[in-house]
Amino acid sequence: MPDQDKKVKTTEKSTDKQQEITIRDYSDLKRLRCLLNVQSSKQQLPAINFDSAQNSMTKSEPAIRAGGHRARGQWHESTEAVELENFSINYKNERNFSKHPQRKLFQEIFTALVKNRLISREWVNRAPSIHFLRVLICLRLLMRDPCYQEILHSLGGIENLAQYMEIVANEYLGYGEEQHTVDKLVNMTYIFQKLAAVKDQREWVTTSGAHKTLVNLLGARDTNVLLGSLLALASLAESQECREKISELNIVENLLMILHEYDLLSKRLTAELLRLLCAEPQVKEQVKLYEGIPVLLSLLHSDHLKLLWSIVWILVQVCEDPETSVEIRIWGGIKQLLHILQGDRNFVSDHSSIGSLSSANAAGRIQQLHLSEDLSPREIQENTFSLQAACCAALTELVLNDTNAHQVVQENGVYTIAKLILPNKQKNAAKSNLLQCYAFRALRFLFSMERNRPLFKRLFPTDLFEIFIDIGHYVRDISAYEELVSKLNLLVEDELKQIAENIESINQNKAPLKYIGNYAILDHLGSGAFGCVYKVRKHSGQNLLAMKEVNLHNPAFGKDKKDRDSSVRNIVSELTIIKEQLYHPNIVRYYKTFLENDRLYIVMELIEGAPLGEHFSSLKEKHHHFTEERLWKIFIQLCLALRYLHKEKRIVHRDLTPNNIMLGDKDKVTVTDFGLAKQKQENSKLTSVVGTILYSCPEVLKSEPYGEKADVWAVGCILYQMATLSPPFYSTNMLSLATKIVEAVYEPVPEGIYSEKVTDTISRCLTPDAEARPDIVEVSSMISDVMMKYLDNLSTSQLSLEKKLERERRRTQRYFMEANRNTVTCHHELAVLSHETFEKASLSSSSSGAASLKSELSESADLPPEGFQASYGKDEDRACDEILSDDNFNLENAEKDTYSEVDDELDISDNSSSSSSSPLKESTFNILKRSFSASGGERQSQTRDFTGGTGSRPRPALLPLDLLLKVPPHMLRAHIKEIEAELVTGWQSHSLPAVILRNLKDHGPQMGTFLWQASAGIAVSQRKVRQISDPIQQILIQLHKIIYITQLPPALHHNLKRRVIERFKKSLFSQQSNPCNLKSEIKKLSQGSPEPIEPNFFTADYHLLHRSSGGNSLSPNDPTGLPTSIELEEGITYEQMQTVIEEVLEESGYYNFTSNRYHSYPWGTKNHPTKR
């Protein structure tokens, strides 16, 4: 019973306590409501005291500025501010204010906060900074409830909040961090993030103009402000209308800078924002212009799943542009994506969302979030599936370019992607099926390239392969692949096992298929009329080669063994000649020929790329065509190769077809397959019938003698096929085909696509009469204007590469010179350190003994005592003498240099020897005497001066020569013996090094006489006195201008001049730079040097900029004002950079406040200039 009574009493006490708390809270809320309902004009601000330890709801709490002052550890604030503080503490964890028992009071408090505080200009202008911050904190807490977000909009609070955020942001970005500025911005960005989280409310934010301020805050230096801005913009970018408005602003370059330089969390949020914005075409274009591809690809090495997922989806969107797709391949993006798909990396992730991160940021907890410690393996796996699906989507877009598709195949991409289609029952069904769909789509796009189709015929069973084919070429709709996935997942275990074995069979990294001679067969590249081509590697080497296998039983080589042997000998002989003679950039290199098992093997250069014939098929399936520029680029290279063969080597190819012309990177042409080529004597004809009939000339079909013009006919056929994507002569009936070729009957090229020059060149090349048909030189003369343009481009490219090479050479030379100079300096410093060690040893030996000497040297020179004992022995006297003699020589040289500089600067006169007064002599000599003498009590400080402090290099206190110049010789002579005595008795405790002491002792009278003779007649004419221009000040002024510009508030729209200056400043303070380089660069800038600035930091948009010499833009739409003819490769000169800097300074009003230029303003001062 007593226990039960005790429990009842405890329950009653807790109930009473709860009621007491509720009553107190109700009372506090009513008091706060009453305080807030007081109009600002009638508001009283009584001061009460409360403990400063409770005054922190934000991440940092600086000293209060205008609301009071600090005294004896307490803040003096208004009653309202204290009540707001208590409210924020009591309800910091509340989320549903509209369902709270005191919901009516909360709504009234919120309404009063908005009407009487937030939108009251009078109150805002007179309220202390901490007071307004607490209003914002209370608004932020209440706006967690969606009901209060609508109330804020209905009261007009969003527009006022946006205006206030703009004012605070401009002060923060323009003049640095003031009191509570960061906390205000963090709370306001949170409020706008909450508003933007609801789809229908995003328009409220953009209408108020808050998105512009949020974009400006991407340049914030405080992490919490930056994160708040990113979170709010990411929520806004979920809607298309908001994305369009955001993408109109200057945002992409800032985002790329954050991705390149900031911390992981900032990168992750920035990547997500950029992923959303890349739905807009102008954003994708800016990513390309601002060289964003290398930045994005560098992040593929990260191990954070959500960051990688966002980056890959950005690549999916930007690689829709053909140029960007090529750039991704050049930067190694295809290899990185395939590496992610291989699944041999350990990834991390987290549970956080935009909303949770925003709340953590506002509460100051965002840095406490941890990564994937709490994520289960299943969650990691699901996120990995999403990332792999994104990589498949990126590869799908990339393989639309035939060269990219070829690289995917070469990098074992078909095998890597095909492994992802296999079902796994342990996987999440929905995620797994989606990944299978993306993988099938990537494989189907690769299958659309004709040369890859044999690979896929080995992968799937017949029924599955039919569904795979029926989907069609280049179908992006992911739902079209769901039937294929369902069919695959319903297969029995044995069929799935067979598909898995088929996938393993196409793995290029498996052991070689077989060996032929010393060559390992790695892959089958293709087949031709006379055999197959393989990718091989020499048994003891690493280089990849191509090897053609020719079947000698082909009827073309003869009907019996004797004819075949004769043909083989001729072919080997011709190939040997070709191997030894042909050196041309557009002709394949041959390395070796050999016979084995009735087969001829030809080892040649491996050409990375695809045959021209495959490009024809691919373009036809995509319903695209060659541009005329690309058509001429390929045709000109063919003409150059044939001219070399025909005119210099007298070789006829005889089998020039699209499959024997390889297109590499940037459409570089390589003519291959010289197995049928024939070297002929001058003016002779060939008679054997060889080659592919579709491209054979009429004289070959009529068995007439032919020459090099047979290749001209073939190149005409190829030009026709580039224009129409179909051969000029085609028929399933061989007789009909031969008739068309002999009569040169073909369909005309469609009009309106290409110029008349294309059709004229085709008709001349396809002249049936060999005598009337032009040779390759005459063909080239027909397109001389096109070739001149081609040559112009080549010359420009060559000049650009030469300049780039010269810049690299100079940079490398400068690097090695600096490295050598540093090495010499290091050796010199070590030598000086060693010399001073011996000097110190000689100074200390007579008083401190060997033990103290060993200790001092160990401390000052950082040498172990044992090492010193080993080096300091019987040769010490000789070493010291050498050191002293060297130092004497250096001192004499220094004196000579000093006097020569004095003679250069001053006029020497013999009539002013009596200009010194007696007091001057006396004071000067006293100073001189004090410099030479030292008491025992001064020894410690002098020793510290000598050693330079702990860890610093010893630096002797040298005698000031300007004092010696003013001392008359008779005064020196009068006291020289006194000085000598002091030198003899007190030199051990003096701070001067031994070299000066010995020099003064041995040559004191002569030195004094010499100094007096050099200085007795010095006089300076008043007319020749001029103000000295301080070079350091000029450098600092120029540096001040640059930093002033880079600290201006960010512009909402693109300002390319400021971008140029910003990049220049970054290059000045980069890790590769140093103080000497900084001084040199600023000096060149001040002098307006015509040299180009290195390194070239221009992005792809600068070549669009032009400016007339008078400063007016050539185009009314070009507001940049950058110097004329800025080319991407050339860069910009220091002179042009100086002009750009001055123009930006004029625009920003830098020179309008000359009177204030050298006045400093304390942070937080309100009366500083506002025009920037």
Curated annotation (Swiss-Prot):
Residue ranges annotated for the Protein kinase domain, each copy included: 519-712
Consequence recorded when altering S684D: Increased mucociliary transport
Active site: D655 (proton acceptor)
Region annotation Disordered: where it falls in the sequence: 855-875, 898-954
Alphabetical list of InterPro entries matching this protein: ARM-like (IPR011989), ARM-type_fold (IPR016024), Kinase-like_dom_sf (IPR011009), Nek10_STKc (IPR042666), NEK_Ser/Thr_kinase (IPR050660), Prot_kinase_dom (IPR000719), Protein_kinase_ATP_BS (IPR017441), Tyr_kinase_AS (IPR008266)
A GO cellular component entry from the record: extracellular region
A Pfam family matched in the record: Pkinase
Protein name: Serine/threonine-protein kinase Nek10
Upper taxonomic lineage: Eukaryota, Metazoa, Chordata, Craniata, Vertebrata
